Swiss-Prot record:
This is Phosphomethylpyrimidine synthase. GO terms for biological process: thiamine biosynthetic process; thiamine diphosphate biosynthetic process. Gene3D superfamilies: 6.10.250.620, Radical SAM ThiC family, central domain. PANTHER family: PHOSPHOMETHYLPYRIMIDINE SYNTHASE, CHLOROPLASTIC, THIAMINE BIOSYNTHESIS PROTEIN THIC.
Length: 459
C-alpha cells in the first residue's frame, strides 16, 4: 500500500500528526505527495501545514490513502456524504456509493451511518476501500451505544467511540465541541432551532443534566487520541442556521468564537484542524461569513455545507446550495460539502450522489477559476478548443461527467458518423455558428476592403 513504509518510519512517536512534523521543519512523504498533486512547492505545503492554514487528513491506520490537502493554497475541495440509516441502505450499498463518489471526483467522503447494520463493519469496509480521506461523526455511534437514550450518554461512551474510529483509520472527525450550555438560550428566536444532528444530541444532553458539553470539557482528551493516529479535527457547527431567517445570528457567531478558541488549543498540541460552517445563508451574507470565520479561527481551513441561498426548492437543493458553494469557494472556503437533490427529503441513492457531486465539482472548479488559481482554466480552454473543432469524443473526455455528456448528445444523434459532424441536434447542419471560421487571409482581405481609399486630387 502507498503509505505503509512512510507510516512504519514513525512507529513509536508520541505525536504522528502532519502538523507536528511540519513544525519540526520536516517535509513528510504526505506533504511531498500533496505538493506534487497540487503543483506547489513542497516547502510551501509544509509551511502552510505548520501554520494551520492547510491540513492533510491522513490517519496512520489508513495506509491505502492517497494524501490530499485542504486549505487556501490548494484547489477547492469537495466532500461527499454517504451512510446507511435505520430505514434504508446497507454495507454493500454504502461501499458502492463510496466507489461512485470517488469515480466522480469526491476529494473526501464522510460516513454518516446511523443504522442499517453493524456500524463498525460498514465503517471498516468503507475505509479499506477508500483512496480518499474518510470522515465520521462519532456522536451518532455513541448514541446508538445507549440505544438512543440521550440522557444515558456519558463522556466515557463518547471517548470510547472516538478512539474506536481513530483505531479503525478514520482521517477526520466532526467534533461538536463548540456548542456550550450558555449558547442554548440564543436559539430561542430561531425559526428552525438546532438543525445539526450531533449538536441536537448534545443540546438535549445539556438540558437533561444541566452540565457543560462533554466534548468541550474533555477536549484535551480528544486531542491526545487524535495526535496518536493523526486524526484531524473537523470542528462541527452545531448552531449553524437551518434557514435563511436564522443566518448570521447570535447563536451561530457565539459558537464560532468558541470554535476559534478550540482551534488554537488543538494547535498548541500540533493537531490539525478545519472548521465547519453553514448551512443556509443568503447570498449577500456569504462573504461576511467566510471573512468572519477566517478572523475568529485564525485562518484554519473552512469547510461549509452549501450554503443554500434559498429555502423554497426541495428536490433541487443541489442547485440552491451549489450557488452558495461557488461564492463561498471564491471568497476563500477550502472545502465544500455537497448537497444532493434529496436534502431535507430522504436518504440519497447512488444517482443522487452523482448529481450532487457533479454540482459541487462545478462550484469548486468555478471558485478556483475566480480565485485565479494557476492552471485552473486549462481544462476549460482545452474543452473549448475541442468544441470549436467539433471533436466530440474529446469534449466528452474532458467533461466532469463524460457519460452524461455522451448520453445527452447521443439521445438524438447516436450514430458514430455524428461524432465527426460539424453540428449537433440543437442547430443542425446549417445554423451552427461555430462553422464560421475566420482565418488570417479572410481578415487581411477584409481589412484591405475596409481601408479608406485615397481621395483623388481635384484639378
Amino acid at each position: 500500500m502507498l503509505r505503509t513504509e512512510w507510516i512504519a518510519r514513525r512507529h513509536g512517536h508520541a505525536n504522528v500528526s502532519q502538523m507536528y512534523y511540519a513544525r519540526q521543519g520536516l517535509i513528510t512523504e504526505e506533504v511531498a505527495y500533496v505538493a506534487h498533486r497540487e503543483n506547489l512547492e513542497p516547502e510551501l505545503v509544509r509551511s502552510e501545514v505548520a501554520r494551520g492554514r492547510l491540513i492533510i487528513p491522513a490517519n496512520t491506520n489508513h495506509p491505502n490513502l492517497e494524501p490530499m490537502g485542504i486549505g487556501i493554497a490548494t484547489r477547492c475541495k469537495v466532500n461527499a456524504n454517504i451512510g446507511a440509516s435505520p430505514n434504508a441502505s446497507n454495507l454493500g450499498e454504502e461501499v458502492a456509493k463510496l466507489e461512485l463518489a470517488v469515480k466522480y471526483g469526491a476529494d473526501t467522503v464522510m460516513d454518516l451511518s446511523t443504522g442499517g447494520g453493524d456500524l463498525d463493519a460498514i465503517r471498516s469496509a468503507i475505509i479499506q476501500a477508500s483512496p480518499v480521506p474518510i470522515g465520521t461523526v462519532p456522536m451518532y455511534q455513541a448514541l446508538e451505544a445507549v440505544h438512543g437514550n440521550v440522557e444515558k450518554l456519558t463522556p466515557e461512551h463518547i471517548l470510547d467511540v472516538i478512539e474506536k474510529h481513530a483505531k479503525q483509520g478514520v482521517d477526520y472527525m466532526t467534533i461538536h465541541a463548540g456548542i456550550l450550555i450558555e449558547h442554548l438560550p440564543l436559539t430561542q428566536g430561531r425559526l428552525t432551532g438546532i438543525v445539526s444532528r450531533g449538536g441536537g444530541i448534545l443540546a438535549r444532553w445539556m438540558l437533561a443534566h444541566h452540565k457543560q458539553n462533554p466534548l468541550y470539557t474533555h477536549f484535551d482528551e480528544i486531542i491526545n487520541i487524535f495526535k496518536k493516529y493523526d486524526v484531524s479535527f473537523s470542528l462541527g457547527d452545531s448552531l449553524r442556521p437551518g434557514c435563511q431567517h436564522d443566518a448570521s445570528d447570535a447563536a451561530q457567531f457565539a459558537e464560532l468564537k468558541t470554535l476559534g478558541e478550540l482551534t488554537r488549543r488543538a494547535w498548541t498540541h500540533d493537531v490539525q484542524v478545519m472548521v465547519e460552517g453553514p448551512g443556509h445563508v443568503p447570498m449577500h451574507q456569504i462573504e461576511m461569513n467566510v471573512r468572519k470565520q477566517m478572523q475568529e479561527c485564525s485562518e484554519a481551513p473552512f469547510y461549509v455545507l452549501g450554503p443554500l441561498v434559498t429555502d423554497i426548492a426541495p428536490g433541487y437543493d443541489h442547485i440552491t446550495s451549489a450557488i452558495g458553494a461557488a461564492l463561498a469557494g471564491w471568497y476563500g472556503t477550502a472545502m465544500l460539502c455537497y448537497v444532493t437533490p434529496k436534502e431535507h427529503l430522504g436518504l440519497p441513492n447512488a444517482e443522487d450522489v452523482r448529481t450532487g457531486l457533479i454540482a459541487y465539482k462545478i462550484a469548486a472548479h468555478a471558485a478556483d477559476i475566480a480565485r485565479g488559481r494557476p492552471g485552473a482554466r486549462d481544462r476549460d480552454d482545452e474543452l473549448s478548443r475541442a468544441r470549436y473543432n467539433f471533436d466530440w469524443n474529446r469534449q466528452f473526455e474532458l467533461s466532469l461527467d463524460p457519460e452524461r455528456a455522451r448520453e445527452y448528445h447521443d439521445e438524438t444523434l447516436p450514430a458514430d458518423i455524428y461524432k465527426s459532424a460539424e453540428f449537433c441536434s440543437m442547430c443542425g447542419p446549417k445554423f451552427c455558428p461555430m462553422q464560421t471560421k475566420i482565418d488570417s487571409q479572410a481578415l487581411s482581405e477584409l481589412e484591405a476592403a475596409l481601408k479608406p481609399q485615397p481621395v483623388a486630387a481635384q484639378e
